[in-house]
């Protein structure tokens, strides 16, 4: 079973399942700045906001609170409001939707298309990891209290990991670059933040007693860039992908490892260069990864969406084009535009059933009751596409 969500009119850049609500919901963003909150049972958006700038990445922060990083160099915190307004979905359709409103925003460098990482420190305090203001090869770390604009402070400025990473024994055997390259991806995995670089290096970072530590470093993707990172919370590991067919598995280091050296003020713990496991996927150029229980989800630049279970192919899907595009040539004759026969997939996510959702079964109409029951009984993967559509597919 597969159904399609339609509201975006430009490339879907990111999507995140929302688990804080009683029924399954989804948050999605696009390259024109539209952000939608979807009810996956009614299959319609229930709230929206137009930021009017390319949204790079989004995160679900908490109950009714979301974060969006955009190309205008701002990270916005957005809250779901109770009041509704008439919102135009496209040229023909308008719907009554709840409001999403900006409640807090801070400046963040977007020189490249890296995402961001947020660590919840409790009591509405957060730690933000992102690219440095002036140098996309370096990292800044900020701490702030949500809603207090005076609390925003940079705790680490322009962190460049090259000297610390290049000093590892594993790096000396393999690493031949004179720099790490730009930061491509961030992801939070418990108390560790993993960073993927243009050079193919994946580094795990922690903050201990106000000191920055390198607790993990992998060179498996070198010299190809890291394209995606995904956190497997069940098995305490992180997956990474690149332009090759290799997906690397990085085990999250145990806490409180002994520090063996310090380079340029950055601590390096024992065995930071531990070897990683490598999975050979049946295709290359894996742009996005996600984990759903024991299933690894991925999308490829070749148009395929793939599911792997125990390193075996569980499913494969490609959304084919069904219409020909026609361009006018310079001599006035219509010419068929040559395009790829498929629509490029982008971000992917997985959703498994939640027993909490059964609390609202009695409040739904018969049709909604049936759809929710079916949704809870299966696993689903959700894919955003370059044409603005989002497919929700049953596994």
From Swiss-Prot:
GO cellular component, one term: nucleus
Main location: nucleus
Compartment(s) where it occurs, according to its Swiss-Prot or TrEMBL record: Nucleus
UniProt xrefs under SUPFAM superfamilies: WD40 repeat-like (SSF50978)
Gene3D superfamilies: YVTN repeat-like/Quinoprotein amine dehydrogenase (2.130.10.10)
UniProt KW keywords: Chromatin regulator, Nucleus, Repeat, WD repeat
WD repeat start and end residues: 7-48, 221-260, 343-386
GO BP of this protein: chromatin organization
Entry keyword annotation includes Transcription: no
Keyword ATP-binding on entry: no
Family: Belongs to the WD repeat ASA1 family.
Function: Component of the ASTRA complex involved in chromatin remodeling.
SUBUNIT field: Component of the ASTRA chromatin remodeling machinery complex.
Name this protein carries in UniProt: ASTRA-associated protein 1
Phylogenetic placement of the source organism: Eukaryota, Fungi, Dikarya, Ascomycota, Saccharomycotina
